[in-house]
């Protein structure tokens, strides 16, 4: 089957600082984070541009999830700096939050809503157009057509994970931050996720993925567990 030609992502270059065209879109220098007096990670440097994929490896407790939360702007680092399009950003910065999609361990799926209702609700929160065609395409990308109207509480963990990942296909955000995205997925769903990730990168998107499963073509950042 020939490779698909995904539509390019929306152009956000107008929010650049002067001269940012020559800089990474996302850059971090010396990031550190502690919890309850314990250093979770420190000295993290990274830089991403269009089409870049970074996999974050490490044992359980090494700080992979905490790093994603810092990079997402959900929590502030204790040291270091984070830059988005050449501008320093802090936790909660709208320019970063509006450009990223985050899927964590918790799927964020309302168990009382169906997959289609969950996608419509997530789209409203994100300010994304949720036309019937867009929602149908996102659900189809993850093979959810037959269960799209079933309450999420009646679905398996794997199907709920598919519904969470379908939001990526709908939102078309520039930066994906994903925490163990293939957890609970069968081989078919994992292949569908990989196809969406490949499309995202070919369209100029970026992704940082905390994972135990190696990703083809990814650069690697390895975190060490701290006692």
Swiss-Prot record:
The keyword Aminoacyl-tRNA synthetase does not apply. Disulfide bonds: none annotated. GO terms for biological process: cytochrome complex assembly. Transmembrane segments: none annotated. Keywords: ATP-binding, Cell inner membrane, Cell membrane, Cytochrome c-type biogenesis, Membrane, Nucleotide-binding, Plasmid, Translocase, Transport. GO terms for molecular function: ABC-type heme transporter activity; ATP binding; ATP hydrolysis activity. Residues 26-227 form the ABC transporter domain. It comes from the Bacteria. It is a peripheral membrane protein. The keyword Cell inner membrane applies. ATP binds at residues 58-65. It catalyses: heme b(in) + ATP + H2O = heme b(out) + ADP + phosphate + H(+). Its main location: membrane. SMART domains: AAA. It is an enzyme of class 7 (translocase). Pfam families: ABC_tran (PF00005). GO terms for cellular component: plasma membrane. Its EC number is 7.6.2.5. It is found in: Cell inner membrane. InterPro entries: AAA+_ATPase, ABC_transporter-like_ATP-bd, ABC_transptr_haem_export_CcmA, P-loop_NTPase. The complex is composed of two ATP-binding proteins (CcmA) and two transmembrane proteins (CcmB). Part of the ABC transporter complex CcmAB involved in the biogenesis of c-type cytochromes; once thought to export heme, this seems not to be the case, but its exact role is uncertain. Responsible for energy coupling to the transport system. Belongs to the ABC transporter superfamily. CcmA exporter (TC 3.A.1.107) family. This is Cytochrome c biogenesis ATP-binding export protein CcmA. It comes from Cupriavidus necator (strain ATCC 17699 / DSM 428 / KCTC 22496 / NCIMB 10442 / H16 / Stanier 337) (Ralstonia eutropha).
